[in-house]
A protein has these predicted regions:
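An alpha-helical, amphipathic repeat domain used for nucleic-acid recognition
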Residues: 1-206
Length: 206
């Protein structure tokens, strides 16, 4: 493989274009040019060409990975699955995840806390938050730590607000039953729901 021309890209800063003898183009970084000692007229052996192609692929995956993780926080498991869907080899996906963890961009413990806080603000209970952490691939050993930040008074306020919104002053047993069922689906336990119903003015028997 012979590099016929090596020139800077007009569209992407710090990107270089290597035009090969067959007319194909390699998009390179400055580091790759230095690492492989590339210049116009340079002939690469098959082994060098393979290593260069692999280096380009690796850097492209890493650049895309950085954009993905800074745009949308994800768990490590979610992130690895997403990379694999982009045809990134599983071993390479794990390597990139390790790299992002070292940089501090991928942190399952912090992500678990964010998810717990988000769903608490949305008015969901602990059971629902656990389901969400499971769905997002957060390791189970991180769940309790994330849920510790949820205060009982926060749950109570969220349930009270939900009942006020749904019932709007109604004490009709059918309306109350529907609201109670909805709270259960949101992940609240019966003791929490019954306490809220008492605060609302309903007689409740456990």
């Amino acid at each position: 493989m012979v590099i016929e021309e090596l020139k800077p890209s007009k569209r992407v800063r710090d990107r270089w274009l290597a035009v090969l003898e067959d007319g194909s183009i390699l998009r390179l970084s400055r580091n790759q040019i230095a690492d492989f000692a590339l210049y116009a007229g340079r002939e690469l052996s098959d082994e060098e060409a393979d290593r260069l192609t692999q280096a380009i692929e690796n850097e492209n995956f890493r650049a895309h990975a950085l954009r993905m993780i800074t745009d949308t926080p994800r768990s490590r498991k979610e992130f690895v699955k997403l990379l694999e869907k982009m045809d990134c080899p599983p071993e390479k996906a794990q390597e990139i995840a390790d790299w992002l963890e070292d940089l501090g961009y991928l942190d399952d413990a912090a992500y678990a806390r964010e998810v717990a806080e988000l769903y608490t603000r949305k008015g969901y209970g602990v059971r629902k938050i656990r389901d969400e952490l499971y769905r997002r691939g957060v390791p189970r050993e991180l769940w309790d730590e994330a849920l510790e930040q949820i205060k009982e008074e926060d749950n109570a306020s969220a349930i009270d607000a939900f009942l006020e919104k749904k019932l709007r002053g109604s004490h009709d047993p059918k309306d109350v039953k529907r609201a109670s069922d909805a709270l259960a689906r949101r992940g609240y336990r019966w003791p929490e729901i019954s306490d809220a119903l008492r605060r609302y003015g309903m007689e409740v028997w456990d």
